[in-house]
Amino acid sequence: MCRPPRGWRSWNLYGNNVNQSLITGIMDGMVKKQTFGGGKPTSLCDLGYCDVGLDDHWQMCGSPDAAPGMHYHDKDGNPIVNKVVFPDLKAMADHAHSLKLTSGWCELREPRAGVAARASLTDPLLVCRWQQLRLFRPL
């Protein structure tokens, strides 16, 4: 049986107005059981909405540590996290997983010429240091 994608994305409601506390609270809300109309206590995750996606504003655009020609990647191609609003992305991902949620975030390649050429900014087998996450070039 085919089901449509189900989950929550930060951009749809908050745009750039996000921070770690807000996203962690959203995660907690997705697993909170509530009773509606006298029925059995149910959470959004019980209904299949178990994916949380952080869209934009986790990265440090315009960082002084950014590589020449880049907006938020260092010289090795690693994204630079905005530690003011997301002090610990690993803790946030761990929190999602402790709640049995899946989580992810939007990562765009830079510069635009690389995107146009369908090139990978980083080594395709690079493993993110804070989470076992592989970055691959899209098809």
Q: Where are the model-predicted features located?
A:
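Aromatic-lined carbohydrate-binding/catalytic grooves of carbohydrate-active enzymes
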Residues: 26, 30-139
